[in-house]
UniProtKB/Swiss-Prot annotation:
Compartments, as annotated in UniProt: Cytoplasm, Nucleoid
Keyword entries, A-Z: Cytoplasm, DNA recombination
Keyword Ribonucleoprotein tagged: no
Membrane-spanning parts: none
Record protein name field: Recombination-associated protein RdgC
Any Gene Ontology biological process: DNA recombination
Gene Ontology MF, one: double-stranded DNA binding
GO cellular component entries: bacterial nucleoid; cytoplasm
Family recorded in the similarity comment: Belongs to the RdgC family.
Domain of life where this protein originates: Bacteria
Organism annotation: Stenotrophomonas maltophilia (strain R551-3)
Taxonomic placement: Bacteria, Pseudomonadati, Pseudomonadota, Gammaproteobacteria, Lysobacterales
Function comment: May be involved in recombination.
Amino acid sequence: MFFRNLTFFRFPTTTDFSEVDTLLPHALLKPVGALEMNSRGFISPFGREEKELLSHRIAEHLWLTVGGEDKILPAAVVNDLLERKLEEIEEKEGRRPGGRERKRMKDDLLHELLPRAFVKSSRNDAFIDLQHGYVAVDTSSRKTGEYFMSDIRGLLGSFPAMPLNAEVAPRSILTGWIAGEPLPTGLSLGEECEMKDPVEGGAVVKCQHQELRCDEIDKHLDAGKQVTKLALIFEDNLSFVIGDDLIVRKLKFLDGALDQLEHADEDGRRAEFDARFALQSAEIRRLFLLLEEAFKLSKAD
């Protein structure tokens, strides 16, 4: 598997991860209970069937995975059944149950339906760079990333992770790049961007499959629009879209990176897993260090 998005968090490089493998067996995902809506806990990066190797580490990169089980119980189904019961009571007793009774009836319905509800499984993966003090979560959702930080915090007892903080406004950097300012070495423009009028409720322009250095784009910039999302290519190895929230979306590993796998000495599924982990973690580190310098990202130490 390859990461498709990157939500970064920083943490002090002095954070101690030495007890992770000892702590993980006590924080594993448990099957969601009959009367529970969801369950969450760590699973092995190698898959749920793996019970021994609960983390994976190569040099200063650590791979952790959180699994989830969620009951699928649409609110519309519950509300429809509740309405039927309310109508039955109204027809038999000539009254419409009030708020407190309605809540009790809804709770009873949930207890009745939950054991029969379908369960949806999920997983979230993260690479932790112990040397440079960042976590890269494979998600485009800040909220999902925060949940992962909470899971690590619960595992370690404390974990002072924080979202990326740029000392220079990301919009100004992205807007400058599309306006013709020099890009960092190795970066080039892709063919996608989003621009917004800075006033609240202002116009939004989205461009795809388009040359970004052109008169049309310049007109929008001259009108005061700022770049909020920008497609970039990092050497021949990565393509992605970065937003002014510093979340990396639509991440793709290109031939320049994937060619390294063809020359890897792979022998079996586990060896292939190791090769992909080593490749991804190394490329993501290179990208992070580039973004750190370009956006003047604050340290967590």
